[in-house]
């Protein structure tokens, strides 16, 4: 049996409180399936850079300790606890490749969820080179932009990376390429999917509200209401109590 770890990273007291539904889902998922779980915070944050860049160093810290590592951004919640990584995600990574990511619902390469082969010298070197792309420090996509640049520029890197275009398998969104939850051309989250990544939702308490709502609906086996999500996106709540007040239905 491969040794598998789930990794995530979350910084800031208020942000951690807002992301707690997602963080709790990952802790539970790891415990349910016997995976190790590592949650990084201020202890691994490189304060000379925007927070997302610390992803690389945090993953490198555990790279040699496991056979496989599944990275999940803090703004994601696991909704189907029954799907095992061994059955649902691992088969998507070919034996000759060391990194799996997705081409997302907004038609971009996305590193919000990654499957990495442990002990890979190439992964370590790739992340080191991505970390060195300092002209991208304040790019809107931060570390993701660095990974995309190397992927597109270097055939050797492209040869080690598997791109999953069935993004919903492990990186489902609720908003598509038109920035709406009613995006007819995009495959968005459906009940039974593994998880939701709330990429593009920038207000922490809005993410909290959407995570909590999605979890409620998943337990009931019900779909999400696109009109409600779109209304919420344009009117973020100012606090946890304000978010909770809109969930009483």
List the predicted regions and their residue ranges.
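Conserved hydrophobic/aromatic beta-strand scaffold that supports enzyme active sites
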Residues: 58, 99-101, 113-115, 195
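N-terminal anchoring/stem segment of glycosyltransferases
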Residues: 1-66, 241-244, 248
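Conserved donor-nucleotide/metal-binding helix-loop-beta segment in metal-dependent transferases, i.e.
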Residues: 78-111
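Catalytic core and acceptor-binding pocket of nucleotide-sugar-dependent glycosyltransferases
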Residues: 57, 121-249
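Extracellular/periplasmic catalytic domains that process cell-envelope and extracellular macromolecules
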Residues: 1, 63, 92-95, 106-109, ...
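Short glycine- and hydrophobic/aromatic-rich loop-to-beta-strand nucleating segment
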Residues: 107, 112-116, 120-121
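The conserved acidic donor/metal-binding loop of glycosyltransferases
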Residues: 73-77
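Short aromatic/hydrophobic "clamp" motif used to bind/position activated sugar donors
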Residues: 69
């Amino acid at each position: 049996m491969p040794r598998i770890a789930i990794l995530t990273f979350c910084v800031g007291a208020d942000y951690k409180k807002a992301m707690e539904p997602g963080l709790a889902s990952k802790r539970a998922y790891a415990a349910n399936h016997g995976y190790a779980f590592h949650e990084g915070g201020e202890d691994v944050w490189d304060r000379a850079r925007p927070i997302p860049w610390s992803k690389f160093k945090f993953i490198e810290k555990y790279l040699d300790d496991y056979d496989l590592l599944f990275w999940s951004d803090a703004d994601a919640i696991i909704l189907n606890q029954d799907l095992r990584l061994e059955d649902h995600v691992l088969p998507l990574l070919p034996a000759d490749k060391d990194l799996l990511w997705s081409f997302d619902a907004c038609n971009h390469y996305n590193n919000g969820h990654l499957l990495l082969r442990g002990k890979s010298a190439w992964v370590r070197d790739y992340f080191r080179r991505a970390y060195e792309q300092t002209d991208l420090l304040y790019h809107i996509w931060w570390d993701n932009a660095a990974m995309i640049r190397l992927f597109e520029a270097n055939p050797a890197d492209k040869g080690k990376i598997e791109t999953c275009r069935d993004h919903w398998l492990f990186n489902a969104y609720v908003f598509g390429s038109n920035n709406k939850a009613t995006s007819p051309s995009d495959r968005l989250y459906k009940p039974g999917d593994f998880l939701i990544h709330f990429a593009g939702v920038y207000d922490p308490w809005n993410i909290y509200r959407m995570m909590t709502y999605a979890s409620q609906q998943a337990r009931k086996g019900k779909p999400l209401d696109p009109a409600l999500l779109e209304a919420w996106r344009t009117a973020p709540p100012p606090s946890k109590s304000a978010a909770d007040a809109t969930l009483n239905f």
